[in-house]
Amino acid sequence: MRIVPPSVFVCVLFVAGTAAADVLQVFSERQGMSGQFIQHIVTPEGELLETSEGQFSLLRPHFVRWQIESPDQQLLIVNENTLTQIDWDLEVVSTRAMTPENRSALDWLMAPARELEQTFDISSSSRQATLIPREQISAFERLEIEFEATSLRWELSLTDSAGQILTVTLTEDPDVMPTRSDFDPPPTDFE
């Protein structure tokens, strides 16, 4: 299994809404969401490296829960400025600060419109947005977001500097709105 930095998982998570407005505008108005995800990591040549799936929850301003259920069991939680990663298969818990230096695509998407416009070349419509950094940033070289309103499904495609592509399908459950307590790391029998 290829290990992908937790910041990559975190960086593609917090996007949802309705197709009535510009995708990034919809994003900026969104307070939270929960649902299921399927994630694929693909080489620049198109070879599938890994597929995983699980549950996610997102809550503004800085809360993310990314629970990988298959093929391994991992939990990534961003609670304000702290990232906690729990790997039940390896029985490991790690914690690190989320700082401006390791700013993820998620942080960029949550930025004010003026900051996005200064940092990225953006093309956007009611269904799709593409963000390309004007200068090198660590998280990605290209982020594409597409929304399927009828199925409440979001397709995210993040291309890194090596040309590797992380695609994530988020299927929103409109009946489940996360609460602040969903982002407290659970206790474990290991540290």
PLM region spans:
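Flexible, processing/modification-adjacent segments and terminal tails
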Residues: 22-43, 47-49, 86-141
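Extracytoplasmic
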Residues: 30-32, 51-53, 61, 71, ...
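N-terminal signal peptide c-region/cleavage motif recognized by signal peptidases
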Residues: 15-18
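One face of beta-strands
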Residues: 33-39, 52-56, 64-66, 156
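Gly/Pro-enriched, hydrophobic low-complexity segments
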Residues: 94, 117-118, 123-191
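Bacterial N-terminal signal peptides that target proteins for export
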Residues: 1-9
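Short, well-ordered turn and helix-capping elements at secondary-structure junctions
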Residues: 39-43, 60-62, 70-72, 133-135, ...
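An acidic-aromatic
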Residues: 55-105, 166-167
